[in-house]
UniProtKB/Swiss-Prot annotation:
Family statement: Belongs to the small GTPase superfamily. Ras family.
Motif Effector region: where in chain: 33-41
InterPro entries in the cross-refs: P-loop_NTPase (IPR027417), Small_GTP-bd (IPR005225), Small_GTPase (IPR001806), Small_GTPase_Ras-type (IPR020849)
Membrane topology note: Lipid-anchor
Top-level taxon of origin: Eukaryota
Record keyword Hydrolase present: yes
Amino-acid positions noted as binding GTP in the UniProt annotation, renumbered to this chain: 11-18, 58-62, 117-120
Name of the protein this chain belongs to: Ras-like protein rasC
Pfam families per record: Ras
Gene3D superfamilies according to UniProt: P-loop containing nucleotide triphosphate hydrolases
Length: 189
């Protein structure tokens, strides 16, 4: 039996969130940019000899949909925060996405992985060197990977790393204490 994990992929518009998700779940690259409002994908995977059903929420990067973010952040068990290596602005937005996740979760730490996408593009187009991504992720205590949805570089590894982060986070008893108590209740209509 597989364990269900809700993963949320966030980042500015146009960084390749949908391309990464579709490459993982459907093994294809979508080149055209069609702004996402919200899509959900599922994929069963075997990670470290355990079977997981990944429920991946691909979110809108555009600012006009930012009001929806709190809602999907609440439900996420882990987050891929994606920027494009050819967009300095998308890299600078990573901190804002992380802060929003921690604010909504009301925690000081949570399972995230920082992703620099579009690593297949020529170095002359690059606006964010790999070391900057690594340093930012390190300052968050988060793993960092550069990916390419187009050439399928580190696509699986990005999602698998997030699952391992969730597993590691869940095994730390201090993190259990930080979570709000599970709500139980009854509704009488």
């Amino acid at each position: 039996m597989s364990k269900l994990l809700k993963l949320v992929i966030v980042g500015d518009g146009g960084v390749g969130k949908s391309a990464l998700t579709i490459q993982l779940t459907q093994n294809q690259f979508i080149a055209e940019y069609d702004p996402t409002i919200e899509n959900s994908y599922r994929k069963q995977v075997n990670i470290d000899e355990e079977v997981y059903m990944l429920d991946i929420l691909d979110t809108a990067g555009q600012e006009e949909y930012s009001a929806m973010r709190d809602q999907y952040i609440r439900s996420g068990r882990g987050f891929l925060i994606v920027y494009s290596i050819i967009s300095r602005a998308s890299f600078e937005a990573v901190t804002t996405f992380r802060e929003q996740i921690l604010r909504v979760k009301d925690l000081s730490t949570y399972p995230i992985v920082i992703i620099g996408n579009k690593a297949d593009l020529p170095d002359k187009d690059r606006k964010v060197p790999p070391m900057e991504g690594k340093e930012l992720a390190k300052s968050f205590g988060a793993p960092f990977l550069e990916t390419s949805a187009k050439s399928r570089v580190n696509v699986e590894e990005a999602f698998f790393t997030l699952v391992r982060e969730i597993k590691r986070w869940n095994q730390n008893p201090q993190n259990e204490e930080m979570l709000p108590p599970k709500k139980r209740g009854c509704i009488i209509l």
